[in-house]
């Protein structure tokens, strides 16, 4: 009888252990997280200088763009695809200084820069000074995946884009009256740099995206028309890996917008990642240290958007505003413009 009782007790204990194991498995087998964050430039973006109608246009385009990337991530797509397709939407809009809405150089031309980085492999691609590639972020990805190089520029980059069957357009495609008028204002004010507080809605025109997919892979990308009235083939931080764009699965994915010269000197995107990796800072702490302390100490302005490997979002800027939006795995949407 005692043997029977002992055997029965053993059976109950075993069954209990199995049920407990199943309960633990159920708890740990939750849906993988993902997140996406975008920006459309930072700068002297003041509510008093933007009409309600214009504000609505900006918010609508930010929402349209981020929902493209969100849907890709929700369906199990890669962070690279989400970043690229989201930036495509912003590049195709004349509202932002990238692609269609690119600013004018001193010579009256439009020159585009872009970069993209894969946090899983640390592969990256970038292009600078192109004039006929409709979507520079597509070129950056093609360089990353179909060339042995990281960065191509000018005519060589355009030749590669043609060989890759990317969308090539006439330079007139990039003309917008608003951007052309901005060039005339900057020239009239005798400002060499594009950051002129006396010009309404002066902003560091750049677009960017950072994303975490369900597989835990991070990616970031940035695209821009650069600086209004720029000369001599000037290139800012946007196509510079580590300065304007950086992604590493161990830490975070970052896209920057700001006064490019200072972001290059500060290696902003990589510095945030390094502070997380070597000092154990959170993405919020690292972003704040770089954007609120390090960059201003040199005299620079701007902001960043980023996401870490856990899906935590950072949107840090030291200017009056930054066009920005985020979405998480729950579908929660946030859109911001000013320093609220």
Where are the language model's segments positioned?
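C-terminal motif of bacterial Sec signal peptides marking the signal peptidase cleavage site
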Residues: 13-16
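Alpha/propeptide regions of enzymes that mature by internal proteolysis
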Residues: 18-340
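Sec-dependent signal peptide recognition
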Residues: 2-8
